[in-house]
């Protein structure tokens, strides 16, 4: 996250609702983790400015990855052979990604899979952006796979992004346990929204013409059953 308001960064209100939902189901040892990019550190200050710290006060423990221990783990990736991630991320029961619905001027878009960059050590992120960014962000997920991905798409960036962009109402929230299926559906929704505003740009009607999603499928992040997903209105 940066200190920019939603949808550039996590909505404090949505985060608070998620924590309340988890607590209502009897969960108490809830940790909210984040790590900003090099130019915005320390994350503690960003979280306070963005309203994240206040949103979970008394409900969950804030964990600022840049203040903790890191572990370098090997990856079976094509473009990333190792990644340095927070030690705490490897020692939790479940990982929930709370992502937004928005375009990204370098990675095309940022949903759940792209959120995994937040687990990467800040000093490694500059190298990440030098080449093969779209493929590399996907491969980070091999180290810290999400058990549940939530896309807060009430408002979306339909151009620009990630910190500044054209915001339009999308009016949706997506959630699922299959990271590829969630991001594919998020892409379809964003593509339709961009088309509505005549902003298709380099986006394709076929999600798998986009490098992030095609590479995620190649990496097996959706398993073998992801094509059978269905959308259920709640």
Question: Where are the regions a protein language model picked out?
Answer:
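N-terminal and secondary-structure boundary signal
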Residues: 1-234
């Amino acid at each position: 996250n940066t200190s920019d308001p939603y949808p550039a960064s996590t909505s404090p209100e949505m985060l608070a609702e998620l924590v309340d939902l988890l607590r209502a189901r009897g969960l108490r040892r809830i940790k909210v983790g984040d790590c900003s990019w090099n130019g915005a550190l320390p994350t503690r200050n960003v979280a306070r400015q963005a309203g994240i710290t206040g949103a979970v006060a008394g409900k969950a423990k804030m964990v600022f990855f840049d203040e903790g221990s890191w572990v370098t783990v090997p990856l079976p990736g094509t473009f990333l052979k190792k990644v340095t991630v927070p030690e705490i991320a490897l020692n939790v029961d479940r990982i929930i990604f709370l992502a937004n619905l928005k375009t990204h001027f370098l990675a095309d878009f940022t949903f759940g899979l792209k959120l995994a960059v937040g687990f990467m050590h800040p000093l490694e992120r500059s190298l990440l952006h030098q080449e093969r960014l779209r493929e590399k962000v996907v491969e980070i997920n091999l180290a810290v796979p999400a058990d549940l991905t939530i896309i807060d798409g009430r408002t979306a960036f339909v151009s620009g992004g990630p910190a500044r962009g054209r915001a339009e109402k999308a009016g949706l929230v997506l959630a699922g346990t299959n990271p590829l299926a969630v991001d594919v559906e998020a892409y379809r929704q964003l593509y339709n929204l961009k088309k509505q505003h005549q902003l298709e740009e380099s986006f394709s009607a076929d999600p798998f013409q986009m490098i992030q999603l095609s590479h995620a499928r190649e990496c097996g992040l959706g398993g073998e059953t992801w094509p059978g997903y269905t959308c259920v209105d709640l």
